């Protein structure tokens, strides 16, 4: 059975039972706990939920947009039929618009049109973070300074949203690649399932091209929350878990011929084998 479902449903239950309802910038209250942490062993099980369906192609494509294409251009995703970031796209006038009121939430230089500003892939490219990581893993296995930080103070004012998953630390122990991921704010129903699966794929890809085996993921969250308009969906998912348990975790296949991280194609080189799930649950997405 899927261990990630155990971890995830336990977290959701903790938030509903012990969380505090608070106001926030979106105008939709959240139920939150201040922090959460969990540990996953990717060498034993690929972490993807079975108590609801997760769309692996979209998840991997978004991850590669950040770390492979190193882009902040929303059109790159749209061309691949991924619309995760549409709500945060800067328009041609340089405005980020409230989808409900039409008001300008933030104004940018028009040169940032069709992007999310200076966040995520923009940071990876500007600071050459991915190449530095790959070079370190190939040439200095005992390097203790392997940190990818998407939180750069000088870039925050020109980002639509500062990176939520903002940091990862990379370790090599006994031939296995391990990461510790830090998340400053977490939409647990929508963001967390995607994010964990994405970083598991990233871990496996990086391990493959650097001659290592995938190891563990430690995940730390500050402000783990469920929006109040997502509670019914989470209760449905918890009911599935409590009445049916979870299903066997699938296996992720990566094309073994790929030796360069930048050659991975999510449509050809990444496959999920044996993925059983209990069906889709739709959650509203707060802007």
Label the predicted regions.
Residues 1-287:
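Terminal, non-catalytic protein-protein interaction segments that mediate quaternary/complex assembly
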């Amino acid at each position: 059975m899927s261990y990630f479902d155990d971890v995830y449903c336990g977290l959701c239950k903790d938030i509903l039972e012990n969380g505090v309802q608070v106001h926030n910038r979106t105008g939709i209250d959240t139920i939150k706990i201040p922090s959460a942490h969990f540990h996953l062993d990717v060498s034993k099980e690929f972490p993807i939920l079975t108590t609801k369906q997760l769309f692996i192609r979209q998840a991997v494509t978004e991850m590669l947009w950040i770390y492979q294409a190193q882009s902040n251009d929303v059109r790159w995703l749209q061309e691949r039929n991924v619309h995760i970031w549409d709500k945060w796209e800067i328009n041609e006038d340089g405005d980020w618009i409230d989808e409900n009121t039409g008001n300008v939430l933030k104004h940018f230089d028009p040169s940032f049109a069709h992007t999310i500003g200076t966040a995520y892939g923009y940071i990876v490219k500007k600071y050459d973070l991915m190449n530095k990581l790959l070079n370190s893993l190939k040439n200095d296995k005992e390097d203790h300074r392997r940190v990818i930080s998407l939180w750069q103070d000088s870039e925050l004012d020109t980002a639509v949203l500062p990176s939520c998953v903002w940091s990862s630390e990379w370790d090599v122990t006994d031939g296995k690649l391990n990461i510790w991921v830090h998340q400053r704010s977490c939409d647990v129903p929508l963001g967390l399932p995607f994010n964990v699966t994405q970083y598991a794929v990233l871990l496996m890809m990086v391990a493959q091209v650097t001659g290592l085996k995938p190891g563990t993921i430690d995940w730390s969250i500050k402000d783990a929350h469920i929006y109040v308009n997502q509670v019914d969906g989470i209760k449905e998912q918890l009911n599935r878990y409590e009445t049916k348990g979870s299903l066997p975790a699938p296996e992720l296949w990566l094309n073994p011929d790929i030796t360069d991280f930048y050659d991975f194609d999510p449509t050809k080189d990444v496959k999920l084998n044996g993925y059983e799930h209990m069906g889709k649950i739709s959650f509203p997405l707060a802007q």
